[in-house]
């Protein structure tokens, strides 16, 4: 894992900004655009403000082994942290989607009587500045779902917490058939493990990834992504979900999935989408559990980040 300086830094990179603007490609007059995604950026540090004691308590409760941090050399541009009782996230003010969303799923959240609200209270997030956030109109007629990262189904006991999952800061543009079927079933699997084992820590987010960048013979240093609406909400190429919980042996266990943002057949073998946490970190520039960097956590670090289960866990969770 990697660490980063936690001191407050400026958001603006005078060198990178005009390059990225020059690379922006608008296609026709539709609400969907294409733009060049830089695969590797120059050094940049995100701003981090201090937390109140209440915020620190929420982060400690929801983010296992520390709040995710940026890896050095991976400037994610201007971001805004959002802390709510049910989740903590970091939202990209450039892409208008979260980089990651942390949750803790336990008996206080799951197995309640709440169903999906009707109508669903999708809305822009007042904690983010207008012009640097997704708006409802960006998704309208875009052809993409407003895809939850912290799902509404993870909050079935308290209406206010479920309503909080409907802020657009917790959404990414997601292919509807993917969002409503294959991805939803993955969310249900994770909830099942949390219920079976009593709790689970979950980190979910988008990826901008082109497999050609893994091979020096095909890597170009950039690739095309799509964006929707007047606010240019970035459409991720992939989504990841990480689950960490205690197995039947009492030891911490982890499993992570990466799925392309596309349509899937009716029956999906989720084993095909298992990846290591380290693999995801290397391709997102995010250190998901920074406290594992401490020397006393070296063995656990190795176990959680590098192990790749060969099979999807059974319904009652891992050994």
Predicted regions and their residues:
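Domain-level detector for secreted/extracellular nuclease and nuclease-toxin modules, and
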Residues: 25-319
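Hydrophobic H-region at the start of alpha-helical membrane spans
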Residues: 15-18, 91
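Bacterial N-terminal signal peptides
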Residues: 17-27
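Hydrophobic alpha-helical segments and their boundary regions
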Residues: 11, 17, 136-137
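Intrinsically disordered, low-complexity sequence elements enriched in Ser/Thr/Gly/Pro
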Residues: 5-7, 18, 35, 41
